[in-house]
Amino acid sequence: LESDVSGDGTPAKQAEAYVELLDKLGIDKVYLLATSAGGSIAIRFALDYPERTRGLILYCSAMPLVEKPKKYAEYAGPPAFLCNNYAMFLLSPMFEPIMGMEPSTIYSMMPVNDRKDGVVLDASITNPDMARNFEDYLIEDLQIPTLIFHAKDDKLASYNDTERALSRFPDCTFVSFENGGHLMEGHGEEIKKAVCDFVMKHD
C-alpha cells in the first residue's frame, strides 16, 4: 500500500528489506509464512538468511521448477491498466470461473489503486524470478524444515508444479487437499493443527 520498493524490487531485495525489519524489531529468527507470489520471496529469504530462519511454510505458493525452462512468461499477472478499483470491480463476477474465488473477494482486495505498484511488481519481477534466475534457487541447499499446503483445485498456483517440486526440498512435510481452491477454503482447522504441530516439532 504505497510503501517504497527496495532497490529493483527483486525477491532478493525484498528479503533484504525483511531482514532490516527484523533487525529493527530485535527479532533474531522467524518462521516464514508465504502465500501465492510471496513464496518466491520467502524461499529467497530462507536461502539467503538460513541463520534467521526457523522454518518455511508455503501456502498455495509459487514453486521452484525442477529444471531450467527454455521459455517462461516475462509478465505473469493482470495488466497494469486493469489494476484499479473500477476495472477489478467490473471483473469480479469472473473471479470464480477464472480464479476459483467468490466475487466478494474483491472487497478484501480494495483499494486496488493503492496496490497497483505491488501487483505490477509481482507480475513483472517476483512471479518470473524462479524461472528467470533458476540457477540461483538451490532448493536442495535449504537448511531449514518446510511445510507445504496445496489444494488440487487451485486455479492460480499449479498443484502439479508443487508435486514436482517436493523432491527438491530436503526436509519437507506436504499437506494436500482435494478442494479449497487458492484460498484453501474449508480447511482452516486442519491447517491450524498442521502449523502448530510443525512449529512445536521444530522449536
Where are these regions (language model features)?
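Glycine-rich "HGGG/HGxG" loop immediately N-terminal to the catalytic nucleophile
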Residues: 1-12
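Conserved acidic catalytic loop of the alpha/beta-hydrolase fold
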Residues: 13-31
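Conserved hydrolase catalytic core segment
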Residues: 28-68
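Flexible "cap/lid" loop of the alpha/beta hydrolase fold
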Residues: 56-86
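Alpha/beta-hydrolase
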Residues: 74-78, 82-137
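Short beta-strand/loop motif that positions the catalytic acidic residue
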Residues: 142, 148-150, 154
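Conserved alpha/beta-hydrolase "acid-adjacent" motif
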Residues: 155-161
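Catalytic active-site module of serine/aspartate enzymes centered on a nucleophile-bearing elbow/loop
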Residues: 171-203
